[in-house]
Amino acid sequence: IAGCQNVVLCSPPPIADEILYAAQLCGVQEIFNVGGAQAIAALAFGSESVPKVDKIFGPGNAFVTEAKRQVSQRLDGAAIDMPAGPSEVLVIADSGATPDFVASDLLSQAEHGPDSQVILLTPDADIARKVAEAVERQLAELPRADTARQALSASRLIVTKDLAQCV
């Protein structure tokens, strides 16, 4: 889609098996164990182990976004995708939802940064309670639990009158 002949991937260590599998499916030629603004700098300027690239795309926290912005403004800078703001997600869950899956969806955004916003809308108070319990269980295993907790402090689980009110 981006028109690149060579595709590289940077991800902080340890790189999850799921990421490695997705990279293989997408034809990624090189993978580097580096993340954050450091990865952006390595990709933008090249390093002993990471090649300089023409385009830098992908998610990241506020530091990554700022690094990408700075790189893109240089005359010799790499092209970037749209600068990202805080992560956000709104999940609508009915009585058939799996609380563990809903909790994972919420936490996948909450862990991006303390300014992330996650919201659950559901007409089922039991689902809301079970999702809240699942979030707490999963937080215990989450490497970025402190960041996710900060985001969750400003997030909401809202029980509505019915599913139509969620929409």
UniProtKB/Swiss-Prot annotation:
Pathway: Amino-acid biosynthesis; L-histidine biosynthesis; L-histidine from 5-phospho-alpha-D-ribose 1-diphosphate: step 9/9. It is an enzyme of class 1 (oxidoreductase). It catalyses: L-histidinol + 2 NAD(+) + H2O = L-histidine + 2 NADH + 3 H(+). Binds 1 zinc ion per subunit. Zn(2+) binds at Q109, H112. Belongs to the histidinol dehydrogenase family. Homodimer. This is Histidinol dehydrogenase. The gene is hisD.
